[in-house]
């Protein structure tokens, strides 16, 4: 019987502040805990049954009677973004924080971007992704200039209306930006953000594309591939790793699409590793401080978890549910928050133990489950 492993990342579902959260302006952050309080209690029967309420105190989600392995994980390196969170889950630790641009990008970067794309630049400052198209979209349509902005994360984003800048041209512009944003100006990601509509009703499309840096070293994805284990990603994870260590990438720009893609792989995959990102708790609800929407997204995920656990064979399959960082929608800011993340791990013989450790324990456990070995050169201790 060939084994399989599934790691599901609930994007931005942080599980409480870290000792250094205050250094990032995130003292007291607790994404899941505060959503639970603000929602009047979480209604997540399947995640509760597995042990989410055993991992951390959550209103409406009491400790499970018979939990699987549960606990909280912490990052080993700096940062609080998608890139570093996913990299750390697979054992790649960034020794220094990726560069951010709280005052916008320097003049030489903007000049190179103008020269390389043949278009002007609007905005050039940290901005909410939805607000920036509301505030600059009309001028963009009038001038054809690209909307270039950043956030508290290490990212350069380019927004453009699909009727003004075709998708292929927008991606080409992002490729120009990716080459510029290396070396001293390196950012974790360059992101294409197409949008549609008319002034007052602009909305992002699902044509987002991420152009990342390569991970800073070998990862557990590389270890799995070296052992002949097929690696699959669902959603944005393939691009987060700049496609390094990934055999097959499956679409998942929305939670329904990523859930459906994961369900398909559960039904069809004979052997391998599936690494899924469920993005909407971050992209749609966390950054927009929408607590009811955040809870609804968790409930949609919970229903999928019920279907997945019914379909999986604990003797054959490892299921890990975790996150990459926080994005507490009850705090004044709209940026990510530096937090612990939850850990739920279901497999035969789990014993209901508590396990607290670094993010990299996830990758170490996947390698142990699928290859029966450890990678001495990578951080992480299996919780199997």
Region spans (language model):
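Feature captures the catalytic ectodomains and active-site-proximal regions of enzymes
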Residues: 1-384
């Amino acid at each position: 019987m060939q084994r399989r492993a599934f790691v599901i990342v609930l994007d931005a579902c942080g599980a409480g502040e870290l000792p250094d959260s205050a250094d990032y302006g995130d003292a007291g952050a607790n994404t899941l805990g505060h959503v639970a309080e603000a929602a009047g209690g979480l209604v997540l029967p399947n995640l509760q049954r597995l042990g989410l309420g055993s991992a951390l105190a959550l209103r409406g989600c009491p400790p499970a009677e018979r939990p699987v392995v549960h606990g909280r994980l912490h990052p080993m390196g700096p940062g609080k973004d998608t890139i570093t969170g996913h990299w750390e889950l697979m054992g790649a630790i960034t020794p220094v924080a990726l560069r951010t641009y709280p005052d916008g990008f320097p003049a030489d970067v903007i000049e190179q971007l103008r020269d390389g794309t043949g278009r002007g630049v609007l905005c050039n400052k940290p901005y909410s992704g939805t607000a920036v198209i509301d505030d600059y979209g009309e001028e963009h349509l009038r001038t054809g200039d690209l909307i270039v902005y950043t956030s508290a994360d290490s990212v350069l984003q380019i927004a453009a209306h699909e009727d003004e800048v075709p998708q292929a041209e927008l991606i080409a512009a992002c490729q120009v930006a990716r080459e510029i944003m290396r070396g001293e100006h390196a950012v974790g990601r360059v992101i294409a953000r197409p949008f549609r509509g008319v002034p007052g009703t602009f909305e992002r499309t699902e044509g987002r594309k991420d152009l990342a840096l390569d991970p800073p070293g070998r990862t557990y994805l590389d270890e799995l591939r070296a052992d002949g284990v097929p690696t699959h990603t669902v959603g944005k994870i393939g691009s987060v790793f700049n496609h390094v260590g990934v055999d097959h990438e499956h679409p998942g720009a929305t939670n329904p699409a990523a859930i459906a893609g994961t369900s398909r792989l559960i039904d069809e995959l004979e052997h391998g590793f599936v690494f899924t990102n469920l993005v909407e708790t971050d992209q749609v609800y966390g950054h927009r401080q929408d607590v009811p929407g955040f809870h609804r997204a968790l409930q949609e995920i919970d229903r999928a978890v019920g279907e997945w656990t019914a379909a999986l064979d604990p003797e054959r399959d490892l299921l890990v549910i975790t996150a990459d960082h926080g994005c507490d929608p009850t705090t004044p800011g709209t940026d990510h928050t530096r937090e612990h993340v939850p850990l739920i791990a279901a497999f035969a013989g789990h014993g209901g133990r508590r396990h607290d450790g670094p993010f990299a324990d996830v990758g170490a456990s996947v390698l142990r489950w699928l290859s029966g070995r450890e990678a001495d050169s990578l951080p992480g201790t299996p919780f199997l």
